[in-house]
């Protein structure tokens, strides 16, 4: 497997810059996930690595070789698309073996590669079926099989699970992760779903507006977000933000309520406190912040509360069954180690 280096990579369409000097090192055998909202440039970046989109500036290096001008077929890369891109008139076997056949490989070699891919993906029972006879998950596995027989140095996945239902997405992300562990391949995976990113990645690259916001292991991003955007994007349910002021070791809301924060956050300044739903705890009467309940969602082991603190929407998840009604006021707090403070203007951590 090969390393992939992006050195000052940019992409422009006329006067519009969609990727702005991206620097990124993807290690050999790494499962790297590019995640971000729609329009952040992650799929464009993947297509540039694949050779499907010209590079406006910077250098793409694959396995130590500059690849900016290399045609896609010379990059030894395989790409799995969101839309499967299967030939409807070919069986699963023929779809998987299509690449080796058009490259002129011997029939016996092609058959062996197809058999190997089918074994990895548990597809033997479906090889003689046409795409219309397969489920969404089976079609995606056929598309993955077509990538495997290419024996690439790098696998590229462009939102491959977006067309699947929720249950099948969970199953397929497990299968893709298991495939990576078996092949020890270099994988660059694009998704807008941060749950996919958190559960599959060795490292995550969070992107927004054509720029990298943070790179790191999933739990590093979760525990130590580089800015308010990353804090709000990583995590499901997402972090709640409450505006106020930090002074003398306390965070104070505009309504005068306060909670203790880390000593490092001393000094009066406008700020926003970010608290993850699972870090809220019920406080003693008259302490903490007042949560005004709007919607209650009991899930069995947990109770999800939607409401407002100081007029701002928040979501709290309690690991117990709590009997509440809309309109009730509940005192809540969080440990200082779980309160993320961000500068009101820059969004950077305090």
Curated annotation (Swiss-Prot):
Domain of life: Bacteria
Signal peptide: none
GO biological process: carbohydrate transport
Family matches, as SMART domains: AAA (SM00382)
EC number annotated for this UniProt entry: 7.-.-.-
Keyword check for DNA damage: no
Membrane-spanning segments: none
This protein's GO CC annotations: ATP-binding cassette (ABC) transporter complex, substrate-binding subunit-containing
Family matches, as InterPro entries: AAA+_ATPase (IPR003593), ABC_transporter-like_ATP-bd (IPR003439), ABC_transporter-like_CS (IPR017871), ABC_transpr_MalK-like (IPR015855), ABC_transpr_MalK/UgpC-like (IPR047641), Mo/tungstate-bd_C_term_dom (IPR008995), NA-bd_OB-fold (IPR012340), P-loop_NTPase (IPR027417)
Membrane disposition: Peripheral membrane protein
Keywords of this entry: ATP-binding, Cell inner membrane, Cell membrane, Membrane, Nucleotide-binding, Translocase, Transport
GO MF term set: ABC-type transporter activity; ATP binding; ATP hydrolysis activity
UniProt keyword annotation of Signal present: no
Subcellular compartments: Cell inner membrane
Residues where ATP binds: 36-43
Enzyme class, spelled out: translocase
Domain ABC transporter: 4-234
Role summary: Probably part of an ABC transporter complex. Probably responsible for energy coupling to the transport system.
Similarity comment: family membership: Belongs to the ABC transporter superfamily.
Subunit and interaction comment: The complex is composed of two ATP-binding proteins (BAB2_0493), two transmembrane proteins (BAB2_0490) and a solute-binding protein (BAB2_0491).
Protein name, UniProt field: Putative ATP-binding protein BAB2_0493
Organism expressing this protein natively: Brucella abortus (strain 2308)
